[in-house]
Amino acid sequence: FGESCIAGRFIVPLGQQVTDQRDCALYKCVNYNKKFALETKRCATVNLKSGCKTVPGGAGAAFPSCCPMVTCK
């Protein structure tokens, strides 16, 4: 695959990033101390406080717009 990283069903070229809309994640292939590394960003896990609820992110939206949001009264 040349200079790239593999993230599940994605091949990410070195220095580029790919959004996984199905799993709401962002993958970036970087050169870290002469080794390829895959940086992965996903939605944060939240603990809801009283009076708060989660609102789903945009269906099919790119990361981070696909992440759920917390709204409180």
Swiss-Prot record:
The keyword Nucleotide-binding belongs to this UniProt entry's keyword annotation: no
Disulfide-linked positions: none
Record-level GO cellular component terms: extracellular region
Pfam families: SVWC
Tissues expressing the protein: Expressed by the venom gland.
Record's comment on post-translational modification: Contains 4 disulfide bonds.
Record keywords: Amidation, Disulfide bond, Secreted
General function of this protein: Not toxic to insect.
Protein name, per record: Venom peptide La1
